[in-house]
Amino acid sequence: MYQSLALAQSPGQGTYADSGAFLHSSGTGSPVFVAPTRMPSMLPYLPSCEPGSQAPALAAHSSWTQAVAADSSAFGSGSPHPPAAHPPGATTFPFAHSPPGSGSGGSAGVRDGGAFQGALLAREQYPTPLGRPMGASYPTTYPAYMSSDVAPSWTSGAFDSSILHGLQARPGGLPGRRTSFVPDFLEEFPGEGRECVNCGALSTPLWRRDGTGHYLCNACGLYHKMNGVNRPLVRPQKRLSSSRRSGLCCSNCHTATTTLWRRNSEGEPVCNACGLYMKLHGVPRPLAMKKESIQTRKRKPKNPAKIKGSSGSTANTTASSPTLLNSESSATTLKAESSLASPVCAGPTITSQASSPADESLASSHLEFKFEPEDFAFTSSSMSPQAGLSGVLRQETWCALALA
């Protein structure tokens, strides 16, 4: 079966003109064979490994056919079992690469058959990681379970890719990840490790840059942007309160204690009292008005109860004013009617007036009225009772004064 595959002509032999690059190791002369899964695709290229006259002899030899039927996945220069254990010139397999001489193939197959089967079992432990794409020579090592001295560099043929070339500069395995951890951490936190070139701050809400590209903190960057100069590093001293400023003295009264320092028209410092006096009167304050202590304004405390009481009395006065007006108008009416009343009705009128509802209303409102005696001056003749009329007047209430 494999003889026909080995002798078959491949349509793509022109593409892989230098097929010996992947069938032979660059360091030794031992052949490199592929795994059984790739055998159908790789066997058509076997005739191109050697000159054309050797291909039929390779297929017809018994040792070659037996080895291919068993498993042609052998060990090259990159296998876990290096060829250094064999003497120079000896092959790793029970067959030779070229057609051997008479009597050499059969005895080698019987002698090394057990070693070859054991090597196949060890080869099955690494089925896929050893399969590398065909490309340029890469100095990278195998994964972490193989040491670098066991896995030398590979040499493969016409497969090229920019991704594979990028792998040359990256160390393989975990050491490469450890080295790239620090730059990734700094990229994730871009503010770490920066320092303001002006004030030396290490942390700021926002990093800025000056005209030359140096980092500035937020305060220095804003100051530089607004004023065009670097932010001063020396902070201004805190100003003392107006009453504790040392060395100040009023130019008018020569006092050093005041609640507020002012300046006169000449720019000289003056105390609050002298400054206000000059501002209000236009003349300097007399020295006789100087006092040792500061006079403060005596403000009376606001009493809400007193304000409320005064407002209540005002309301009562306002409410009682219409009552006074009505009482005065009613008194005027009484005077007018009394002057117009007849002398006959004068006596009963006074009697009925004492018991009228108007008197009760006046008494309830606590209003006192003074009646002048000339308004109610009656003669004795008018006050004397007349026969036949006194009883009727006392019982009837038709009198105008009584109705009022």
UniProtKB/Swiss-Prot annotation:
GO terms for biological process: aortic valve morphogenesis; cellular response to BMP stimulus; cellular response to hydrogen peroxide; cellular response to nitric oxide; endocardial cushion fusion; heart development; heart induction; intestinal epithelial cell differentiation. InterPro entries: GATA_N (IPR008013), TF_GATA_4/5/6 (IPR016375), Transcription_factor_GATA (IPR039355), Znf_GATA (IPR000679), Znf_NHR/GATA (IPR013088). A zinc finger (GATA-type) spans 196-220, 250-274. It comes from the Eukaryota. Residues 71-112, 293-332 are annotated as: Disordered. GO terms for cellular component: chromatin; nucleus. CDD domains: ZnF_GATA. Residues 87-101, 309-323 have a biased composition (Low complexity). Disulfide bonds: none annotated. Pfam families: GATA, GATA-N. Keywords: Activator, DNA-binding, Metal-binding, Nucleus, Repeat, Transcription, Transcription regulation, Zinc, Zinc-finger. Residues 296-305 have a biased composition (Basic residues). One of its GO terms (molecular function) is RNA polymerase II cis-regulatory region sequence-specific DNA binding. Residues 102-112 have a biased composition (Gly residues). Transcription factor required during cardiovascular development. Plays an important role in the transcriptional program(s) that underlies smooth muscle cell diversity. Binds to the functionally important CEF-1 nuclear protein binding site in the cardiac-specific slow/cardiac troponin C transcriptional enhancer. This is Transcription factor GATA-5. The lineage of its organism: Eukaryota, Metazoa, Chordata, Craniata, Vertebrata. The gene is Gata5.
